UniProtKB/Swiss-Prot annotation:
Source organism of this protein record: Neisseria meningitidis serogroup A / serotype 4A (strain DSM 15465 / Z2491)
Gene responsible for this protein: slyX
Protein name in UniProt: Protein SlyX homolog
Pfam families on file: SlyX
Family matches, as InterPro entries: SlyX (IPR007236)
Family recorded in the similarity comment: Belongs to the SlyX family.
Length: 74
């Protein structure tokens, strides 16, 4: 193989690697965007839960207890 063919082969291999890396990066970017949406949703749910706890007993000196949530039949 002469030098020109060797360079063409190396350039072709680099182009293939670059295309594969672009696909991987696009996939990772989509995954990061999906995880960001999930995190935003979880943060909103946590804020809502915290607000409900505060609204339920805003002047409480004691921390919130799950025992307060026991149904009356227990």
């Amino acid at each position: 193989m002469d030098a020109v063919q060797e360079f063409e082969h190396r350039i072709t291999e680099l182009e293939i690697q670059s295309a594969l890396q672009e696909d991987v990066i696009a996939g990772l970017n989509a995954m990061v965007a999906e995880l960001r949406q999930t995190l935003d949703l979880q943060q909103a749910q946590l804020r809502l839960l915290y607000q409900k706890m505060q609204d339920r007993n805003p002047d409480a000196q004691e921390p919130y207890s799950l025992r307060d949530e026991i149904p009356p039949h227990y």
